[in-house]
Amino acid sequence: MTLQPAILSEPDTPAPAEALTRVSPMMEQYHEIKAANPGLLLFYRMGDFYELFFEDAEIAARALGITLTKRGKHKGQDIPMCGVPVERSDDYLHRLIALGHRVAVCEQTEDPAAARARKSVVRRDVVRLITPGTLTEDTLLDARTNNYLLAIARVRGSTGGDRLGLAWIDISTAEFIVTECALGELAATLARINPNEAIVTDALYSDPELGPLLRELAAVTPLTRDVFDSATAERRLCDYFAVATMDGLAAMSRLEATAAAACITYVERTQLGQKPPLSPPSREIAGATMAIDPATRANLELTRTLAGERRGSLLDAIDCTVTAAGSRLLAQRLAAPLTDAGAIAHRLDAVEAFVADPILRDGLRATLRAAPDLARALARLSVGRGGPRDLAALRDGLLAADAALAQLAAATSLPQEILAAMAALRRPSRQLADEFSRALADELPLQKRDGGFVRANYQAALDETRALRDASRQVVAAMQARYADAAGVKGLKIRHNNVLGYFVEVTAQHGERLMAAPMNATFIHRQTLAGQVRFTTAELGEIEAKIANAGERALGLELEIFEKLTAMVIAATDDLRAAAQAFATLDVTLALAKLAIDDNYVRPEVDGSLSFAIEGGRHPVVEQALKRDGQPFIANACDLSPGPAQSSGQIWLITGPNMAGKSTFLRQNALIALLAQIGAFVPAARARIGIVDRLFSRVGAADDLARGRSTFMVEMVETAVILNQASERALVILDEIGRGTATFDGLSIAWAAIEHLHESNRCRALFATHYHELTALSGKLPRVFNATVRVKEWHGEVVFLHEVMPGSADRSYGIQVAKLAGLPPSVIARAKTVLAKLEANDRGQSARALADDLPLFALTARAPAEALPPTEAEQLIAALQALHPDELTPREALDALYALKAKLPK
């Protein structure tokens, strides 16, 4: 969703005077804090609840489905209010952030008792600004997905060619990337990055061309122009990364620097002045990754299905990773396949090494399975939101690094990518792991404020303080026995309440003894009740103070230790970050090796040619689904390589019936190319693929009512993108172009599109169609090759063989598919009659003449069986269904078998 334009103002912004008149002190404070944080939902701490007021309450109540009530009045009007319990606030925050809202968390910063003593409202301050793109908490993040904040800056071209600078950050993993693109490339780039929040200028947000595209993102935050000030961008970047000049950072354009500076400015504001330690910006080189437009990503279901689910996507099918960081890296690679054959070969070498060594592969996967998410633990500690378990995660990660290095050291001839990962794993000092092992207890609380996370015997002062805290009962019990003996009062008790603290209590008859000399020198009278008299002593007061402070002092000492350990972590940030990346790289490589072994994938040959030769290709997702059902996948070859037209062609024109597997064949070849270029083995018997620089898919379509576009219009827009942008190195798959309009219109469009692909784009393409007339183009265009999907007719039934072979189909078998779908028999019978008449007249008869010639279609009272007699196959199936094998004698079974054989056609 899109949020209101907002500036994350500094906390000293004054509130409007009119908002502060005639309100209670609490509401006055609320208005001041709210005015300093416009555009954010204010979670205002009130005891054990966070409360929201006015419009914030109405928004939150709708979004969370909680009760909207009221609290007092403001200017004579009821104040809308809703609230959520503090202890469950993370759940509510997660839901609000997922909907694109931003939240300011306002906490009580003093004890209410201190406020009462001052006769004033409790002091409160905003301690966190939570936005969709600046999350670090595990409870708010998806462990397997990056959480990107994206900044977009624009410069107007003198001839109308606008350029855009993009910078995106994941502060939960410290990634920071910049690039520059043309306006026409923005949609594909946004689809690849998939940001959780985008920041832009007010002007860009309101731009008639860019605005609609931006508003399709999950959350957009318009900011004032000063955040995107190019004149101060380099200084802001240098200040953030503590370098004297931009020479200390990666080379980047002024436009990229502007976007990068906007990112870090927004991060600093949302983190209330803290500077999360980010990796220096890395510059993404234009053309280094395969360009994939949004429609193609959606159609191929790379990371999400068309229904928005991860399950059933390509990512779900190939994700064998055992760590969250590995899963994130695999998704990144799938979103941005490489176009450098050398870099792809390095990745494939690493996968092949693990394919060839099952013992090393399985052992390393077991080691990585125990490795925590180092990157996100490091990020939380860096911004002050970490806990003891994050320190333990780093300890366990370093121990896992040692184990992994020991396993890898036993291997020989490791490829470059694995050697680089080993070097990164060696970087962190092992003193960190040793220190954390000595310092951290076995059982750790979630929050550092809970205490109890430092191991006994780590610090003497802490042990002494804990002993006093934990031994308080024994100390008081010993004092009680000593006082009872000294006073000669066996019933003397030491008790405690919140008013008097610790006190000595005796019955009324013994009270006079303690108030008389010499006992009154020790026991000081405090209170007389009906049946008891209460006293205190100087010693008891001292012990009470020690006991009361012991818990606080113990926690304070633990927090000091926590800060010391955290400082050690921050000092080693770069080394720990490198180790975290190495874990992710190893995990992805191992996962792809396991996938190759489990599903019989092969190493593709990827080079700089224009080849595309697949033998025994399979669809990775469909194959897995069929395997679960115990069914085989029919493999098919595809050769789009340049060569003689009679053997193949760079444009395959595929005809065949519905349900035969044309769309699956199209998609599987696109996915094989994509898998090859992320450095994965592929589902085929053999594959040689020349680098694909752009991947286009126009498969299936739905209307876009929000933009006022029909299904056919969506289809034409997607086709236009392909015809205008596909290069010689592109791979294009097109399914049934022109089907959404009149037959001859659609045929004409499809015909012209094929000619354009052949003559102008000159790319590799798969074109599936039901316009059989198009097959004539293979005789006219030398690089067009006809292919068809085999079917077999058997006694009036159609059997889909799912085999792609040279040739063309003369029928689409639509009526047979309609019958399989369950259309009423009377409709099927009527359709056959109409089809026969159409075919007899070769479609040359006018619609009016055809309607006059055919008898009127009318439903009768005839039974469906009379309308369409069962086929021989249906009769055989019915006979088999009527048999009950467990109830037949051997003789009856034999007779039944002969009877069935007799029903078979001669």
UniProtKB/Swiss-Prot annotation:
One term of GO molecular function: damaged DNA binding
Keywords, sorted A to Z: ATP-binding, DNA damage, DNA repair, DNA-binding, Nucleotide-binding
One GO cellular component, as annotated: cytosol
Binding positions (ATP): G656, P657, N658, M659, A660, G661, K662, S663
GO biological processes: mismatch repair
Coiled-coil annotated spans: none
HAMAP family: MutS
Task of the protein: This protein is involved in the repair of mismatches in DNA. It is possible that it carries out the mismatch recognition step. This protein has a weak ATPase activity.
Family: Belongs to the DNA mismatch repair MutS family.
Protein name as it appears in the record: DNA mismatch repair protein MutS
Originating organism: Rhodopseudomonas palustris (strain BisA53)
Gene behind this protein: mutS
